[in-house]
Structure formats: C-alpha cells, structure tokens
Amino acid sequence: MASSVISSAAVATRTNVTQAGSMIAPFTGLKSAATFPVSRKQNLDITSIASNGGRVRCMQVWPPINMKKYETLSYLPDLTDEQLLKEVEYLLKNGWVPCLEFETEHGFVYRENHKSPGYYDGRYWTMWKLPMFGCTDATQVLAEVQECKKSYPQAWIRIIGFDNVRQVQCISFIAYKPEGY
C-alpha cells in the first residue's frame, strides 16, 4: 500500500498595530473599595434589622379557639350557592367524578383513638349514595347536596372531586355546615 505524507508549515507573524482607536486598556482587576461610598449603620439595635419599612402589613393568623379548619377553602366564609355551583363546574370541567360525603359528629380532623403525629380521626366520612359517574350538570350535584341536607340537617357535607384515571382525590371542600359552626 502506498502512503503519502503531506507536510505543511505555517508561519505566524506578529504585527504591532499602533493605532490609538483600537487600543483597549488591559484588565487590572476589581476596583478598590475606596472608590465606592460607604455608609454603615451605627445603630447596633437588633430590632432595626427586621424592619420592612412599613410597606407590608402583618396578616392575622388563624385563631385556634372555636375556629375549626375543615377542608379546602375553609379559611373563607361559607360558600354561597353560586360559588358552590362554580366550584362544581370547575370539578366537572377537569373531568373529575363528584362524590358527596357527610359526617354527623365531627366535621373536622381530631385525635381520639391514637396520639401519633401522622394519625387523625375524622378523615373518613360516610358516602352519600354512590359517586356520580357520568354527571355533567353541576345543578344535579347541588340537588344531591340539598337532599342530603334534608336527611341530615345536623351533618357536615363535603363535595369531593375524584380522578378515576389516577385514582386520587383531587379536590374536597365543605358544601354545608350545621348551625353554630
């Protein structure tokens, strides 16, 4: 087999361009701190560190006495029928199956049978009828809420949106609370 070797030599030459317009000053590092004005606080009071300038007002936290927290949206006032209708329409628009549950004694989570941190009683409620598979009308769901309310006037009623593909509960909110809660 024949092989060939090709050699080429390149010669680099340096030319000094001494035009004043193309000269760039060399990088000499960061500027010294002496060129910047320095203003230091002389007040060593620790309370002055946490000041937000009065621009933000503090928010009130949830009062723990006689104000039970239930489900999603429980920090808001009770939902009106129009607001419930919009929530159920949102639930149906996402393709979730509406389901009604009710609880006659405790409408909130509590600890009675076990004291470990991850365990709560009151998470599981009684289902009202069967889940409403195939339901496309939000007024039909609210009619079931009214029927449940007539049967159990002293019960908490919640609406759940269940995703039957992923098999998870996607939304849950209180639709009715008894008087005094």
UniProtKB/Swiss-Prot annotation:
GO terms for molecular function: ribulose-bisphosphate carboxylase activity. SUPFAM superfamilies: RuBisCO, small subunit. GO terms for biological process: photorespiration; reductive pentose-phosphate cycle. Keywords: Calvin cycle, Carbon dioxide fixation, Chloroplast, Photorespiration, Photosynthesis, Plastid, Transit peptide. GO terms for cellular component: chloroplast. It is found in: Plastid, Chloroplast. RuBisCO catalyzes two reactions: the carboxylation of D-ribulose 1,5-bisphosphate, the primary event in carbon dioxide fixation, as well as the oxidative fragmentation of the pentose substrate. Both reactions occur simultaneously and in competition at the same active site. Although the small subunit is not catalytic it is essential for maximal activity. Belongs to the RuBisCO small chain family. Heterohexadecamer of 8 large and 8 small subunits. This is Ribulose bisphosphate carboxylase small subunit, chloroplastic 2. The lineage of its organism: Eukaryota, Viridiplantae, Streptophyta, Embryophyta, Tracheophyta.
